[in-house]
Amino acid sequence: MKLITDKASNGLQSNVFSEFLLTRVPKTEFTAIEANELEETLKAGLHQYPGLGISATQLGIKKRACYIKFGDEETGRELFLLNPVITERSKEGFLFYEGCLSIPKTIEKPLKTIRSCKIKVQTDNLGELEFEINPEGDKVDERVSMETMMTVIVQHEIDHLDGITIKDRIYSTTITKKNNYGRNDKIVMKSPTGELVEVKYKKANDYFLKGYEIV
């Protein structure tokens, strides 16, 4: 599997932002040999970066696959997802701070994003998987739980395969400021599943947390 390289460093190009990151990569068929080769390539790529996951597109490979590794050898978890597609998302959302290898500035200054609390993912190699945040677990030792981290990372990496970056997931109410809404003004908001609701602006934040946006 050919990688994008940086001749100056004789290694993988860091902070890759290839043309593939802005386009959705379709599903393709893989032989067992091709799948194994791609998995090893992604493992090698992530080994050289201080990240928790990496998509094939970040390495300049136009294939729908990603590799995730979070935690230590004993209690951690790693996943290789082949042709992953998110088939279901919860209406509820939660806020998180994310950085991305392809956007260097966000490594030191993460962006505040909004993610779905629960997702279902269909893959060619592992079948259907479910990921859901664990708010109670997040309170233990003031650390983010394994369940919550995996829910975020999986969404992050699949986004890359759909041509989406964390800049597209930023939690912001900037649009409301531009329109100068009054607290009691009525606005129309759309849910992640397309449902439209009319609410007063003062209630908008409750809906933002569920993944709604103003239309």
Explain the meaning of each model-derived region.
Residues 1-188, 192-198, 202-215:
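Positively charged
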